[in-house]
Curated annotation (Swiss-Prot):
InterPro entries: Pre-rRNA_process_TSR2 (IPR019398). It comes from Xenopus laevis. One of its GO terms (biological process) is maturation of SSU-rRNA from tricistronic rRNA transcript (SSU-rRNA, 5.8S rRNA, LSU-rRNA). It holds the Pfam family WGG. Belongs to the TSR2 family. Residues 131-147 have a biased composition (Acidic residues). The gene is tsr2. This is Pre-rRNA-processing protein TSR2 homolog.
Length: 189
């Protein structure tokens, strides 16, 4: 009986490694070093920590496992999982632990093989986007238009138009709408 317990615990550890190894969120965190220079070691530590969590707590519920995984991801990788995949990972771990406890080694080994085939090759690519000169100028114009307000009795918009020169002054007068808003039209180039 003790040999079977050790064997099922080793099998569950292997199953945990397969589940976490096929989880894209953890793979992205490791590949991009979200956990620092020791990201791979932290992922391996998670396997042992989850194995220990299951063996030291009887009758874990899926939400408890999910909370534990979320805590590990947040603490070790500074990652908050928002895609809902942690629920699937927790469910798989609970099912595999139950199967290991009941001695269903063939089913667990089949799941491990399935997860090994399904392992994702996920790499997040970071692209730097530099706006062109035209885009920078147009965004500056938009900011200028947003900075000034034209309220009745206020001369700040008129003084701003005069300070910018006649070429930048709007040709049409701003028209107040029925609901009290003022429509500001963008100048054309």
């Amino acid at each position: 009986m003790a040999a079977r317990s050790v064997d099922s615990r080793g099998l569950f550890r292997e199953a945990t490694k397969a589940v976490l190894g096929s989880w894209p969120v953890l793979q992205i965190a490791v590949e991009n070093g979200f956990g620092g220079s020791h990201s791979q070691e932290k992922a391996e530590w998670m396997v042992g920590a989850i194995d220990q969590y299951f063996s030291s707590n009887a009758d874990l519920e899926q939400y408890e496992v999910e909370d534990s995984i979320m805590g590990m991801m947040n603490d070790e990788f500074d990652t908050i999982v928002e895609d809902g995949s942690q629920a699937l990972v927790a469910q798989q771990l609970c099912v595999l632990f139950s199967q290991c406890r009941q001695g269903e080694t063939a089913a667990v080994q089949a799941k491990i093989a399935q997860l090994a085939q399904k392992k994702y090759d996920v790499r997040a690519k970071v692209q730097e986007v530099t706006p062109s000169d035209d885009e920078e100028e147009s965004s500056d114009d938009e900011e200028e238009a947003m900075d000034c307000e034209n309220t009745p009795g206020s001369s700040s918009a008129a003084s701003l138009s005069g300070a910018l020169g006649p070429s930048s002054a709007p040709k049409k007068e701003e028209e107040p709408e029925d609901d009290g808003w003022t429509v500001v039209r963008r100048k054309k180039k």
